[in-house]
Amino acid sequence: MKLTFDGISPHWEEGIPFGNGRMGAVLCSEPDADVLYLNDDTLWSGYPHAETSPLTPEIVAKARQASSRGDYVSATRIIQDATQREKDEQIYEPFGTACIRYSSEAGERKHVKRSLDLARALAGESFRLGAADVHVDAWCSAPDDLLVYEMSSSAPVDASVSVTGTFLKQTRISSGSDSDARQATLVVMGQMPGLNVGSLAHVTDNPWEDEQNGIGMAYAGAFSLTVTGGEITVIDDILQCSGVTGLSLRFRSLSGFKGSAEQPERDMTVLADRLGATVAAWPSDSRAMLDRHVADYRRFFDRVGVRLGPAHDDDEEVPFAEILRSKEDTPHRLETLSEAMFDFGRYLLISSSRPHTQPSNLQGIWNHKDFPNWYSAYTTNINIEMNYWMTGPCALKELIEPLVAMNGELLEPGHDAAGAILGCGGSAVFHNVDIWRRALPANGEPTWAFWPFGQAWMCRNLFDEYLFNQDESYLASIWPIMRDSARFCMDFLSDTEHGLAPAPATSPENYFVVDGETIAVAHTSENTTAIVRNLLDDLIHAAQTLPDLDDGDKALV
């Protein structure tokens, strides 16, 4: 199925996302340009650092006592006084943008038609520019670890390529020899900001710590540009392409990220040198690259399918916006929309989560803002779970690996959070996580900030995957995560009039009214009780399956 869209897409939200799990881009079409909003899944502000929470076991105990008396107003205020002094997590940042601007002498582009081929993970575009019919393909290859933008034209056109970004600092350009002016390489390098010391409640243009106190990771990107039928000249860090009938732009990023608990590389030139040295070895055969990309993608995409109405072949064009605007009684409208959304959901996860990448975050892998909504972090009170619900039912076992890895990395900070904040053993993770695996509460109201069940709920995803794949080696790999999450949950249980339950408790981002006052902290909540009940059921199931548990683990269940 190929989703098609008529007209330009000047807004990021209207663009076409694509990615290979590690890198991603959104392709937007302006009146005279294509813009690639580029992302690398490891580009975050900050670095590993020690941090403590204002929330303590003593404060939680006071709130528990108040809530047990039915004094939910006091319980909320006790927790609120601490959570409003918390810090927020770090921010997922954009790499920058690559702009391919077409000459305006021929006028604006006309008859623009855009497409997303869900069966091949291929973004497409066609338009008329003067006398030229122009076609664009764009994809991001996992096998070659390259993002590709390919333009072909029926007549010579002029275009320019430029790269910009808030955190980019320097550019290096090398062009072909005088006898070969059809190739150029552009290497950009930048520096992520240091710690975000601001908060979502009070967003400013400069929430960063002073650079004298700390800077973030370095990063670099290499662009290889080749043209057909014309030449490239360099003017002020812009690659001018004159009289070309073909243009091939390839991109690879490299960040200074070394691991969630390791200080990153902060020297831009080290990364630029390392990345620049790889360009000569990049593959040159675009057709072979595309074939490898499609074959790699389809080994995931072809595992399942849904048919609710008439069959759609891979090349069938579905005018998506037109169908959305059509009347409800249009034949097969709902069937087509449902099939498209099923395929699009799988496409997004295949494109944003691969083995050994970072997990798919709040916006997958795509972000164009320096201060994205909710920092585009890992929101564990619903969003990251939703991203991965499909791995089992859609036979995408490999794609859950980043979520498993992240939860393994969260165990140490989760142990610290459980002990220092809640006075419990095991591992507790609050609702916002970043690449540095921050497990502490976020800044703000208890309705979101006081919810230490992020890892416990992610365990549902991890165990659900086992129920589909029945792989005992996989189950053994997630056992320590489930075990330590369960230890925390068991320690946090209290006797209530309805039996054992986590107390005090919230239900994520939910309020209730007592005596005319809107509050968030109750003695118990069905949300947290259900998560604990489910985790303990899953733990017992896992323990009955795994043959080699040690005595301590056997005693737990």
Can you name each region flagged by the protein language model?
Residues N383, W451-E465, Y474-D491:
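Extended, hydrophobic alpha-helical segments in both membrane/secreted and soluble proteins
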Residues M390-T391, C459-E465, L535-L539:
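Buried hydrophobic packing segments
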Residues M1-P446, F453, D464-Y466, R483, ...:
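Aromatic-residue-lined binding/catalytic grooves and analogous aromatic/hydrophobic interfacial grooves
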